[in-house]
Amino acid sequence: MWIKELELKHYRNYDHLLASFSSGLNVFIGNNAQGKTNFLEAIYFLSLTRSHRTRADKELIHFDHSTVSLTGKIQRISGTVDLEINLSDKGRVTKINALKQAKLSDYIGTMMVVLFAPEDLQLVKGAPSLRRKFIDIDLGQIKPVYLSELSHYNHVLKQRNSYLKSAQQIDAAFLAVLDEQLAGYGARVMEHRIDFINALEKEANTHHQAISNGLESLSLSYQSSVVFDKKTNIYQQFLHQLEKNHQKDFFRKNTSVGPHRDNLAFYINGMNANFASQGQHRSLILSLKMAEVSLMKALTGDNPILLLDDVMSELDNTRQTKLLETVIKENVQTFITTTSLDHLSQLPEGIRIFHVTKGTVQVDSDIH
């Protein structure tokens, strides 16, 4: 898939913008604080209805307006789709082909994106919540049912934690009802995650071995707070551990086990990647991003859109070449932001260049 056209009204420093793109490489050049990242963020937001930079929708609204509108024309294998998001103080409205979408899971996945931003380099050593978010964003685009089950899980988890905080003593019968619901949704969330990580590991290892010239292997491990012996037993063992932890959870006023506490670990040649070099971290993250692209194509039949936000300068020529070879070979529409073309020595022909200045975007040329 690829985005043919994007229109922004009152988005951050863009008062009004209408732009059309190449189905291949699109490069946005400009000084810092001109709007390059805002532009990629808008594409990301149109896809996922959320920003990767802020949780506050009001920060997305142009300073002298009260509403935001984003519309995009997406070319999928199945045909052209129009997406629209409108934000105001009354909330947000999402539309597909002018039809309002009641559920988030009905909207997300229509336009898939993979973002590679400087903060992704913290994925290995950062908090476990970053790695859970990484899994949730990818899985939510690939499997809409996952988003629905995760939403149900979080709703029951909130109920359970609220009860634990407010109860003077445990009502075992009431807690048992919540436990059954939580274990049911949670087991399905974990099953989806485990399948995803297993598939992602195969793709990521292939890319990592190519980047390292066969010197390194990459493996991933889903680390669950729920102890289980096999995937088919997750529900029963999760439920058992919830019941076993009633007193501990009551004392701590929160739920101690479940997918909300799970983690993801990375290993290079069998060693924890927390102890890897900075160069190995860059190769690992690059391998993951290329694996995301490959896996989305394999599981959905359509390519995602790749957003590279100021990361090419973080990669040496070898890693740049591997990345661009992949997106060109797989025919992936790619958006690159940069302050200069000087370090992009490996750019191929047939790219479209845009200049970004103070919230305006001008097409330079198509290079053939």
From Swiss-Prot:
InterPro entries: DNA-binding_RecF, DNA-binding_RecF_CS, P-loop_NTPase, RecF/RecN/SMC_N, RecF_2. Keywords: ATP-binding, Cytoplasm, DNA damage, DNA repair, DNA replication, DNA-binding, Nucleotide-binding, SOS response. CDD domains: ABC_RecF (cd03242). GO terms for cellular component: cytoplasm. PROSITE patterns: RECF_1, RECF_2. One of its GO terms (biological process) is SOS response. Pfam families: SMC_N. Coiled coil: none annotated. It is found in: Cytoplasm. SUPFAM superfamilies: P-loop containing nucleoside triphosphate hydrolases. Gene3D superfamilies: P-loop containing nucleotide triphosphate hydrolases, RecF/RecN/SMC, N-terminal domain. GO terms for molecular function: ATP binding; single-stranded DNA binding. ATP binds at G30, N31, N32, A33, Q34, G35, K36, T37. Belongs to the RecF family. The RecF protein is involved in DNA metabolism; it is required for DNA replication and normal SOS inducibility. RecF binds preferentially to single-stranded, linear DNA. It also seems to bind ATP. This is DNA replication and repair protein RecF. The gene is recF.
